[in-house]
């Protein structure tokens, strides 16, 4: 994991929660140095487009953790409005996906690098994005604010194993979930 972003003098990611529906969190992730902004799990395009515009941020990427509509429903509208590239799990049907992600792949936002970790349980193809140097993890619906995500496609054993993986992250990693 090496030297973290702050020690390298690298600008830290600016992460903003954008509430949607009754209990979703859509995440705007901005890199000041490059000017690039990603949206994590945009179930609805309007709130993230509005928030990004107010901040003067240009959305260049969409990162989906799984296929559920409350996490992908805004993909096409964001892509149409911004030209953003959409990345999501290879094993799932992600609307508008340009890049299929599997275990060990990477996503990049400026100089920030996130590794893709497959975390089946909530859905079979569910992924998490872990930015080791930034001490940030986007876990989608693997973890909710008050416990683990519901089991729709995976097994309790898979979910438990992935809870252990998340629990094994360094203590200072900030976890960003979808609900």
Describe every region a protein language model picked out.
Residues 8-57, 129-140, 146:
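Conserved beta-strand hairpin/beta-sheet module of binuclear metal-dependent hydrolase folds
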Residues 123-178:
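Metallo-beta-lactamase
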Residues 21-23, 37, 44-118, 135:
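Active-site HxH/HxHxD metal-binding segment of metal-dependent hydrolases
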Residues 42-43, 89-90, 103-104, 140-141, ...:
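Fold-independent oxyanion-binding glycine-rich loops
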Residues 29, 41, 66, 78, ...:
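Divalent metal-coordination and catalytic microenvironments
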């Amino acid at each position: 994991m090496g030297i973290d972003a702050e020690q390298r003098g690298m600008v830290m990611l600016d992460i903003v929660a954008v509430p949607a529906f009754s209990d979703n969190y859509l995440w705007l992730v901005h890199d000041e140095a490059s000017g690039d902004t990603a949206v994590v799990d945009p179930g609805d395009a309007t709130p993230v487009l509005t928030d990004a515009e107010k901040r003067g941020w240009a959305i260049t990427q969409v990162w989906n953790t799984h296929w559920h509509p409350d996490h992908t429903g805004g993909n096409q509208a964001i892509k149409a409005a911004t030209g953003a590239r959409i990345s999501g799990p290879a094993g799932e049907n992600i609307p508008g996906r340009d890049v299929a992600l599997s275990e060990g792949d990477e996503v990049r936002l400026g100089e920030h690098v996130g590794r893709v970790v497959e975390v089946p349980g909530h859905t079979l193809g569910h992924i998490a994005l872990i930015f080791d140097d930034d001490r940030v993890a986007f876990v989608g619906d693997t973890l909710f604010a008050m416990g683990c995500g519901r089991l729709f496609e995976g097994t309790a054993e898979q979910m438990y194993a992935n809870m252990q993986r998340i629990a094994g992250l360094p203590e200072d990693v900030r976890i960003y979930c979808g609900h």
